[in-house]
Amino acid sequence: KIARVIPDLPEYKGVIAISFTNKASDELKRRCKQRCADTKQSFFGTIDKFYISQIIIPFSSHVTGNITEYEIVDNIDESSKYALLLEEPFSSKKESILVEGLQEGKIFLKYTGETALYILENVPGAMQYIKARYSHIIIDEYQDCGEIQDKVFIKLVVEWINRNCCGRYKSSNIWFYKTIPKISDCSDEKR
């Protein structure tokens, strides 16, 4: 699918190709480069890598008002001021803690989806950038997406142009999205 799309794109555009592991992303990129040598401005990587490199780092300064260097925080100490993030469910209080973390240069790996969604909803330039740079988003094994990935995907679907989700057809998410005309399911296509 990706190799059919890329040749028709202008040099400044690419596709977003999301896989769930770095190994799968590397393999997908390798296969695409075999079929079309120039992948242009395409992104190949995991969903977290996409959130961090294409949404959070470039646009968090629009939320925080300052530019800082970021560290990825894998674990949250239960005694830290960020411990509320460990409680369920996600809330507006947690959202403000994520923003506070960004102000202090912290990106919480477990909450990259929530952080990216917050930025997409509050920084118009983030969605404009995604639309300007990428023509398609293709998510491999979409049935393995969690709730927050699903929300981000819906946000992109509502405001964007071309999308494909690859996964098992009978999966609940894929089945649901067959009813949305903007989404195509490539679960039956050869990869």
Predicted regions and their residues:
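Conserved RecA-like helicase ATPase core segment
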Residues: 152-191
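P-loop NTPase Walker
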Residues: 1-60
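Hydrophobic "anchor" residues on beta-strands that sit immediately upstream
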Residues: 42, 136-137, 164
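Accessory N-terminal region flanking or inserted into the helicase ATPase core
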Residues: 14, 61-138, 147-152, 175-183
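Active-site flanking residues adjacent to catalytic metal/cofactor-binding acidic residues
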Residues: 45, 139, 167-169
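Conserved catalytic network of the ASCE P-loop NTPase/AAA+ motor domain
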Residues: 7-10, 37, 128-130, 156-159, ...
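Catalytic P-loop NTPase motifs of RecA-like helicase/translocase cores
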Residues: 50-51, 142-148, 172-174
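Short, well-ordered alpha-helical packing segments
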Residues: 2-3, 29, 33, 117, ...
